[in-house]
Structures are given as structure tokens and as C-alpha cells.
Amino acid sequence: MTTVVKHFLRDDDLTPAQQAEVLELAARLKKAPFAERPLEGPRGVGVIFEKNSTRTRFSFEMGIAQLGGHAIVVDGRSTQLGREETLQDTGRVLSRYVDAVVWRTFGQKRLEAMASGADVPIVNALSDEFHPCQVLADLQTLVERKGSLKGLKLTYLGDGANNMAHSLMLGGVTAGVDVTIASPEGFAPLPWVVEAARARAAETGATITLTGDPQTAVVGADALVTDTWTSMGQENDGLDRVGPFRPFQINEALLAKADADAVVLHCLPAHRGEEITDEVLDGPQSVVWDEAENRLHAQKALLVWLLAQRTGDRP
């Protein structure tokens, strides 16, 4: 048995070919939810939430059950994560109990520290910097609506420094999608993430565009994406997270500038009337409910794929 441990801490942890394999498997599992049962036994997956969650918790718990396994769910208050022992040591210990660890946490370095000691896959269920499982679901949704991903134009509008913008850049260009990030002054993506995304884009032929003009950013776009203007933990950061963002709201007028067949995505929860209007969120071009469902299928596919890397079995 091979013992390769593959983690999914950020979107570019998957090569373009590996990402395509996961998305293909996600489509298969959506049609046949119980076709893969690698956790039969049941075997366990540790699921740790240091940040509150609705979609992530429901989709991972149900997905693990459909894969034949048992989710051991804990929150940050009921563990000693990073307090009584190093995160590396925690990774070593948890590897003796479970087959994978799914962790929704704060700083990315916490995930990297645990992964450095773990002998089982560590999955980023959301960090301050990245939200890679969500972007797998977004890409699955785009495949369903658009077919091929390569060459699609995706425009994200909002806080360019949030985890969705970062993951859309990394995951999008990995799939060959041309990604535009439109954000107000002072809210651009972190430079080191842009550098990593441009490096991956150079491999796939995709492009990355950063702009402060939402009107030109959406012209001809195949997909518009937004997220809340105030992410968890930013409620009291002292920044004006309303006024500068108003021009970046996805409304019917802005959507009309995109391609006639453009789709609209939002990872949810949505602040209706802020980053997106009711008319767009509930309108015919919105695919947010399919996108939310696809969290289940994409995450199941990811777990199946990661577990197979350890055993050498092909899902």
C-alpha cells in the first residue's frame, strides 16, 4: 500500500488534471450518490469548526454519511487546538483515530501546521485566506451550465481580499477560467495570492485581471460572483464596508452588461439588498441553489479522491 498523503489546504494544491478528476467524480456522485463507499465500516472523519457554519456542516456531515463513514464533529471551544500541544502534534494524534480531518478555522498557517504533522488528508473547510471547497462546488456548477470551463470569463465583485476572491483566482485559473476581480480601492486581493494565481495561470493559459471599475469588469462575463461585504470576524474592524461597495452590488442593471446567458453565483449566506438584490438572487440567471447543493457532491468527490491517493485505488 502506498502512503502518499495529499492535503487540500488551498485551491492550487490540486493540479489542473487532478482538479478535473475531482470535478468529473463530483458529477458522477451527483447522479449516483452511493456509488463510492470508501468510509464503509464505518471509518471516521474528524470535522472541526472554529467558525460557525451551516452549509459546510450539513454538506460535510451528510456527505461523510453517504460515503459510509462517521463524522466526529467538534467546535473550537471543546478542543485544545493549539493550546495544550502544538498543531503538528494534534495532526499526528488525530491521524491515529480518523481517516481525514476537515477543519474550518482562522489563519491559513494553522492548517499548514496541522498538515505538517498529519498522516491523513487535511481539508480546508474555510480559512481567513481561502475557501477551496466552495470553489470546487462553483466550478461544478459552471460545468453543468456552461460545459467546458476553459476560456470562460468569470467576474467577482466585492472584497478582493476575502477568501472567496482568493480561491476563485486560484481555483478558477487552475480550470482555465479567465478571472476578473473587481473591488474598491483598499480592498484588493493580497499580493502573495495574486502572485500564486498568476503562476498557475501561466501553466493553464488563463488570465487574471484586477480592476476597480465594476461596470467594465462585467462586460461579456459568463459568470458573476459575489460574497458578503463583511466576512466573519470583520464586523468591528473599523472599515467602511458599505459605502465603497455600493457600486459593486450585483443588480439587474449591472447584470445586463454581462453576457446574455451569464449566470450568477453566491456562496451564501446572502445579505439581500447589499451585495446582491432580491431580483437577481431569485431571478432566472441565479444558480446559487444548485451551487449550494453542489457543496455536497464536490466535497464527497474530494474526500473520495484524497483517500484514494493514500491507497493507490482509483475512484
UniProtKB/Swiss-Prot annotation:
Carbamoyl phosphate binds at S53, T54, R55, T56, Q80, R104, H131, P132, C133, Q134, C267, L268, R295. Pathway: Amino-acid biosynthesis; L-arginine biosynthesis; L-arginine from L-ornithine and carbamoyl phosphate: step 1/3. GO terms for cellular component: cytoplasm. The keyword Transferase applies. Its main location: cytoplasm. Its EC number is 2.1.3.3. This is Ornithine carbamoyltransferase. It comes from Rhodococcus jostii (strain RHA1). The lineage of its organism: Bacteria, Bacillati, Actinomycetota, Actinomycetes, Mycobacteriales.
